[in-house]
Amino acid sequence: MGNFHATTIFAIHHNGKCAMAGDGQVTFGNAVVMKHTARKVRKLFQGKVLAGFAGSVADAFTLFEMFEGKLEEYNGNLQRAAVEMAKQWRGDKMLRQLEAMLIVMDETTLLLVSGTGEVIEPDDGILAIGSGGHYALAAGRALKRHASEHLTAKEIAKASLEIAGDICVYTNHNIIVEEL
């Protein structure tokens, strides 16, 4: 059997608020949509942290559990938990095989965490990953730049995913948005 994957996750810090959106599509291989309503964005650490994943579903659940453990270990310090998780992920032969990426955020910090050991904080407070990530990122940057006084973080996140869903065949319009 092949891998279950493909999604789009978008996150933004905007006007003192933060929001993360993800679509619900799970694709089996490159040809079959297996699920339309997957929940790929979650609140962690007593609702103070948002996390979203793109990639293999089973791998992502493993990473969610691992990240949540690091958050507990480091008392909710997002940056420290992300760095320690990335070190463990990169340094462990079995974990290196996991095929997923995470975006994690709290009210002040937004980070991309990958299995290559990268922990990246964007300059503009916007991140997007997954098959429709480039489309969502472009849409989100345009919306923030040209309509920021009229839109909330949640509205920008949702609109960015809707635009990605119009373009990317691996992104659907069953959008879940979480905010802090």
Swiss-Prot record:
Binding site for Na(+): G165, C168, T171
Keyword match Protease: yes
One Gene Ontology cellular component annotation held by this UniProt entry: HslUV protease complex
Active site: T7
Regulation: Allosterically activated by HslU binding.
Top class in the EC scheme: hydrolase
Gene3D superfamilies: Glutamine Phosphoribosylpyrophosphate, subunit 1, domain 1
Enzymatic reactions: ATP-dependent cleavage of peptide bonds with broad specificity
Compartments, as annotated in UniProt: Cytoplasm
The keyword Cytoplasm appears for this protein: yes
GO MF term set: metal ion binding; threonine-type endopeptidase activity
GO BP terms: proteolysis involved in protein catabolic process
EC number: 3.4.25.2
InterPro entries documented for this protein: ATP-dep_Prtase_HsIV_su (IPR022281), Ntn_hydrolases_N (IPR029055), Proteasome_sua/b (IPR001353), Proteasome_suB-type (IPR023333)
Keywords associated with the record: Allosteric enzyme, Cytoplasm, Hydrolase, Metal-binding, Protease, Sodium, Threonine protease
Family from the record: Belongs to the peptidase T1B family. HslV subfamily.
Subunit text: A double ring-shaped homohexamer of HslV is capped on each side by a ring-shaped HslU homohexamer. The assembly of the HslU/HslV complex is dependent on binding of ATP.
Functional summary from the UniProt entry: Protease subunit of a proteasome-like degradation complex believed to be a general protein degrading machinery.
Stated name of the protein: ATP-dependent protease subunit HslV
The organism of origin for this protein: Bacillus cytotoxicus (strain DSM 22905 / CIP 110041 / 391-98 / NVH 391-98)
